[in-house]
Amino acid sequence: MKAMMVVGTTSHAGKSFITTAICRILARRGWHITPFKGQNMALNAYVTTTGGEIGYAQAVQAWAAGINPRVEMNPILLKPQGNMTSQVILGGKAAGITTATNYYEQYFDKGWNMIVHSLERLAVEYDFVVCEGAGSPAEINLKHRDLTNMRVAKYLNAPTLLVVDIDRGGAFAHVVGTLQLLDESERALIKGIVINKFRGQRSLLDSGIEWLENYTGIPVLGVIPWREISFSAEDSLDLLERRRKEQKEINVTILRLPHIANFTDFEPLDAEKTVSISYLDLNEPLGYPDAVIIPGSKTTINDLIALHESGIAKQLQDYVAAGGIVLGICGGFQMLGEMVFDPDQLEGNNVSYAGLNLLPIETVITPEKIVRQRHTCSVYPYPGFPITGYEIHQGVTRSSKSPHQRIKTTNHPLFEDGSLGIVNDNQSVWGCYLHGIFDNGAWRRNWLNYLRNRRGLPSLPTGIANYREQRETVLNQLADLVEQYIDLTPLLNN
């Protein structure tokens, strides 16, 4: 199977960005290609048409390649849960929860076999695979059990691109150090270096590049300038850097939960020119934005406890009582109710926990994980729009059965499938299980218009395309940028 690999000197060097761009570049040239990342650690996940769970970044790369995401593109997904544990997703299915030490004892051989099997299946259908590494390929304490960097490159005999982030400083040292820590057979696969996120005059790098090429014997194939292009972040390090202060017509606050998951849900909101998004730490005052979103969570109960202990829970209750709007998605939806029950103690040491008391519902955490794509139609905020999204959760939510129910309101279904979400009588509290809900353009605009009309602002047009069309524009922008500044010829000719 013909292949190439993209690795980085550090995390966040730009591997995903460049891999995605290369997928789109080659697809535009008519190549029948597929992305691949043997093992990914991320909280942003996507559900394939077969009900398998993969990293969201690999789904984006598949779309860049012009194909549908599938589990073979990311056979191992690790979803951190806190307390040094992660949920292991093998071949798209939850396989268990483990620590880092136990993971390699339990899953190393099984994981490598899964990687090889996935590559063999992809080889049957695709002519070329663009592989992405993880972290750094030169972590000395991890190299012997690294499943996703040079082990994959050597298996495929793939010419490899080494990416370095110069914006952090120390780029030349990062490159030289990484190469020195690779063994000879691994270094032989490195066919080019890319300097990413460069700010300033390109000619100032010339002497450094000349030295680097002479010292390493490896050509610098490109210098990518810093560009403000919206791109799916893989984990919360990027999220922490996204603190938008600019106020716009509609201001939405998203709670930065300790175990936040699937915050890629909010990219379509971020792309709305009249909407300002800010992520709020739980030790900050809530204020009075136009809406507050409680996002998905990898551990609903732990994040619910954090909301209570931080005082945000009480602030949310006061905010709603004063006329504010709250939307909970997935784990955030589960938190909105009166109680969350955990009879098997899957997430905590108790069997019941007080919710936020904003909706007359209760949730029971269950061992079975629901992972599936969904297609339905809207009921609120406007009926009849086709809706697509996906569920990833453990737990069943139902109307509260408490004889002392405190919340005197009626639940109204958000969608024709009432199990997917509800809204209360005065449309101040919304909850849904659907990830990707804002990808649905007409639904997103109608929900935003509801917020706008409350402020006396005119409605925006609702006859707009879904976010996938905007994403296509972004993918083409990424490809244009990389194609302009990187010479891929040495990698493709090999």
Curated annotation (Swiss-Prot):
**What are the entry keywords?**
Cobalamin biosynthesis, Glutamine amidotransferase
InterPro entries on file? Class_I_gatase-like (IPR029062), CobQ/CobB/MinD/ParA_Nub-bd_dom (IPR002586), CobQ_GATase1 (IPR033949), CobQ_N (IPR047045), CobQ_synth (IPR004459), GATase_3 (IPR011698), P-loop_NTPase (IPR027417)
Query: Which residues constitute the catalytic centre?
Result: C330, H435
Q: Name one GO biological process term.
A: cobalamin biosynthetic process
What are the GATase cobBQ-type domain coordinates in residue numbering? 249-443
Q: Which SUPFAM superfamilies match?
A: Class I glutamine amidotransferase-like, P-loop containing nucleoside triphosphate hydrolases
Spell out the Pfam families in the cross-references.
CbiA, GATase_3
Pathway assignment reads: Cofactor biosynthesis; adenosylcobalamin biosynthesis
Q: Which NCBIfam families does the entry link to?
A: cobQ (TIGR00313), PRK00784.1 (NF001989)
Q: What does this protein do?
A: Catalyzes amidations at positions B, D, E, and G on adenosylcobyrinic A,C-diamide. NH(2) groups are provided by glutamine, and one molecule of ATP is hydrogenolyzed for each amidation.
Q: Which family does it belong to?
A: Belongs to the CobB/CobQ family. CobQ subfamily.
Q: Can you say what this protein is called?
A: Cobyric acid synthase
Q: Which organism encodes this protein?
A: Crocosphaera subtropica (strain ATCC 51142 / BH68) (Cyanothece sp. (strain ATCC 51142))
